[in-house]
Amino acid sequence: MTSPRTILSGHDIAPKKSLGQNFLCDPQAAEMIVRKCGLSKADVVVEVGPGTGALTIPAAGQAAWVYAIETDGRLIEPLKETVRAAGLDNVTVLHRDIMKTDIREICREAGRKLVVLGNLPYYISSQILMDLVEKREAVDRAVLMFQQELARRIAAPPGNREYGRISVALRYCAELSTVARLKPNLFFPRPGVDSEVVRIVFRPWPGNRDCDEALFFAMIKSAFATRRKTIKNALSAGMTKISPSAWEELLVRADVAPTVRAETLDVGDFLNICRHYKAMSGNISTKEA
């Protein structure tokens, strides 16, 4: 593959730090990452942030179709040129912000669940992950690169200081595995830390069909919004439909000590709190909650 440095310099493009741009420049690493997707000729891929096409080209060689979604308009023509040079006719390059793109529409058009692939910039990785969680009916699996710090947060267990909202959300609805670690010298420009490749296989229904998911996600957001507060104080500050004293009673009923912090609770604890909240608060709207 033509190196990202060569492609960028040929178009007088400098990487933007504000977009977290670190381009994968090792073809063997790119092939390995795409292999971890387990693609077949029936699969439709959505690639987030294709850049200069390091992952796009091998993915298109194995999948039925690739939708390459790039927010940086400067990279659109270079990416299209790379696709044409590879002789591929199964790639759609889209100049869009992934956070303003409803992948469920692509899923409906494709007629099957999607495989999501990408090298995600640190500044927006958590938002993209939560968006995938909430739209997971459209996604079968994802293989994503993250800076090591975020990868550790994703995989952190309860009780770990890295454990947080995204850890709970993914444990609720997916199986995760770290499949590779990449050194900074495999990117241009070099990031300051290692990157990790995480494979995520989504479970559309995690066995909790009675769970109000919107309420569940609102609850974990409130629980981790102020990490140093006790779970009672965090939830009563973020979800005010019931009083702090009622929150204490609710938590005791849910077999959760009101004085612990959110980082000590597992998915089952949050689901139990959620069920007791619904029972105590009655039929209130999640938006109001």
Swiss-Prot record:
It catalyses: adenosine(1518)/adenosine(1519) in 16S rRNA + 4 S-adenosyl-L-methionine = N(6)-dimethyladenosine(1518)/N(6)-dimethyladenosine(1519) in 16S rRNA + 4 S-adenosyl-L-homocysteine + 4 H(+). InterPro entries: KsgA/Erm (IPR001737), rRNA_Ade_diMease-like_C (IPR023165), rRNA_Ade_Mease_Trfase_CS (IPR020596), rRNA_Ade_methylase_Trfase_N (IPR020598), rRNA_adenine_dimethylase (IPR011530), SAM-dependent_MTases_sf (IPR029063). GO terms for molecular function: 16S rRNA (adenine(1518)-N(6)/adenine(1519)-N(6))-dimethyltransferase activity; RNA binding. Gene3D superfamilies: Ribosomal RNA adenine dimethylase-like, domain 2, Vaccinia Virus protein VP39. Its EC number is 2.1.1.182. Keywords: Cytoplasm, Methyltransferase, RNA-binding, rRNA processing, S-adenosyl-L-methionine, Transferase. GO terms for cellular component: cytosol. It is found in: Cytoplasm. It comes from the Bacteria. S-adenosyl-L-methionine binds at residues 22, 24, 49, 70, 97, 119. PANTHER family: DIMETHYLADENOSINE TRANSFERASE, DIMETHYLADENOSINE TRANSFERASE-RELATED. Belongs to the class I-like SAM-binding methyltransferase superfamily. rRNA adenine N(6)-methyltransferase family. RsmA subfamily. Specifically dimethylates two adjacent adenosines (A1518 and A1519) in the loop of a conserved hairpin near the 3'-end of 16S rRNA in the 30S particle. May play a critical role in biogenesis of 30S subunits. This is Ribosomal RNA small subunit methyltransferase A. The lineage of its organism: Bacteria, Pseudomonadati, Thermodesulfobacteriota, Desulfobacteria, Desulfobacterales.
